[in-house]
Design a protein with these regions (language model features):
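N-terminal glycine-rich anion-binding loop in soluble enzyme alpha/beta folds
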Residues: 1-69, 136
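Nucleotide donor/acceptor-binding cores
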Residues: 16-18, 126-129
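Short histidine/acidic/glycine/proline-rich micro-motifs that form metal-
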Residues: 51, 88-91, 119
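Phosphate/pyrophosphate-binding loops at sites that engage ATP/ADP/AMP, CoA/4′-phosphopantetheine
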Residues: 70-80, 122, 127
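Short acidic, glycine-rich surface-loop motifs adjacent to enzyme active sites
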Residues: 74-92
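Short, acidic/small-residue loops that bind anionic groups at enzyme active sites
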Residues: 100-123
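An alpha-beta-alpha
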Residues: 128-136
Length: 136
């Protein structure tokens, strides 16, 4: 009988880890997110958060109360580099600082982003001072 010793190879550091908190009712956010990061070396993990009907400020704030638990379940006991809370209206209703605090309880080392805060940062970076919106 022949045997060959194979020494294991360890990866010292993985790609940046991004966790997404997706609304239970949002069927597209993962696909959209993957399209944004597809050519980048990013490891992407998702968990869903329960949403409540009707969509009221009170229900959006109620939903935000679950952010810490939902965040904990994204790679439990592992660090993430960034956590994205994928609910624009929920961020505005509860406040970005509140969402950030709730995420940091579960993943203290993670940066926190939301669609609304990312848009504001992009507008500032591009030095855009005025935005016009046309809706029906």
């Amino acid at each position: 009988m022949n045997s060959t010793k194979i020494d294991p190879k360890f990866i010292g550091r993985s790609n940046p880890r991004v966790g997404l908190i997706a609304l239970a009712s949002d069927f597209m956010i993962e696909k959209d997110f993957i399209n944004v990061i597809k050519d980048k070396k990013i490891d992407f993990f998702v968990n869903r958060i329960e949403c409540y009907n009707p969509l009221t400020k009170e229900n959006l704030i109620k939903m935000s109360n679950k952010v810490t638990d939902v965040t904990k379940d994204i790679l439990p006991d592992q660090d993430l580099d960034c956590v994205v809370y994928g609910c624009t209206s929920g961020t505005i209703a509860a406040g970005h600082d509140t969402i950030e605090q709730k995420v940091k309880i579960a993943k203290p080392m993670a940066e926190v982003s939301t669609p609304s805060t990312a848009a504001i940062q992009a507008l500032k970076k591009l030095n855009i001072k005025k935005v016009s919106i046309f809706t029906p």
